């Protein structure tokens, strides 16, 4: 009799996070978007080879695109496809969501950035956010509040 081999998959895992965005912006609203990817990109994402730093969302012809994100190709990638690490990737959002984001981005001071990329089942999802930039004194205040919360938790724990 053969024994069944149990393979554990991490389907709910985070692939990449944009910690810089959480530091530099006030997050107003979050959205979940799918991504249109090529085969070699999915293989690289399974290996966790993605960087969201310096990336943002652009809108062109009523569609949303992820610009500036890097997906590093694996060394074992297909030889007949030339991988481009910083390719602009189309985001899959509903027309209502695109309209909502586009209307807010056209207002002064608002921007749209990716926060995280993760697996949802067998699909790759991108968490994007409508954000407003922080000034230097806002960053200092946020850091001061975070330090106070940490100290308060440390005092309460004793």
UniProtKB/Swiss-Prot annotation:
Q: Which GO terms describe its cellular component?
A: cytosol
Query: By its UniProt entry, which Gene3D superfamilies does this protein fall under?
Result: 2.40.280.10
Major localization listed first in the record, in broad terms = cytoplasm
Q: Which Gene Ontology terms cover its molecular function?
A: RNA binding
Q: Name the UniProt key words of this record, in alphabetical order.
A: Cytoplasm, RNA-binding
> Which superkingdom is the protein from?
Bacteria
Q: Which GO terms describe its biological process?
A: trans-translation
Where is this gene product found?
Cytoplasm
Instruction: State its role.
Output: Required for rescue of stalled ribosomes mediated by trans-translation. Binds to transfer-messenger RNA (tmRNA), required for stable association of tmRNA with ribosomes. tmRNA and SmpB together mimic tRNA shape, replacing the anticodon stem-loop with SmpB. tmRNA is encoded by the ssrA gene; the 2 termini fold to resemble tRNA(Ala) and it encodes a 'tag peptide', a short internal open reading frame. During trans-translation Ala-aminoacylated tmRNA acts like a tRNA, entering the A-site of stalled ribosomes, displacing the stalled mRNA.
Q: Which family does it belong to?
A: Belongs to the SmpB family.
Q: What's the protein name?
A: SsrA-binding protein
Source organism per UniProt: Acinetobacter baylyi (strain ATCC 33305 / BD413 / ADP1)
């Amino acid at each position: 009799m053969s024994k069944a081999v149990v393979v554990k998959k991490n389907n709910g895992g985070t692939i990449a996070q944009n910690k810089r965005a959480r530091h530099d912006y006030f997050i107003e609203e979050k959205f979940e978007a799918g991504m249109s990817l090529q085969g070699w990109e999915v293989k690289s994402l399974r290996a966790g080879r993605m960087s969201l730093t310096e990336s943002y969302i652009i809108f062109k012809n009523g569609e949303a695109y992820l610009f500036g994100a890097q997906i590093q190709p694996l060394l074992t990638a297909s030889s007949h496809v030339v991988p481009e690490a910083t390719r602009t990737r189309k985001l899959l959002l509903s027309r209502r969501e695109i309209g909502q984001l586009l209307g807010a981005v056209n207002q002064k001071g608002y921007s749209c950035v990716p926060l995280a990329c993760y697996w949802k089942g067998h699909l790759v999802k991108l968490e994007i956010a409508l954000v407003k930039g922080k000034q230097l004194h806002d960053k200092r205040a946020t850091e001061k509040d975070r330090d106070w919360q940490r100290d308060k938790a440390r005092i309460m724990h004793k």
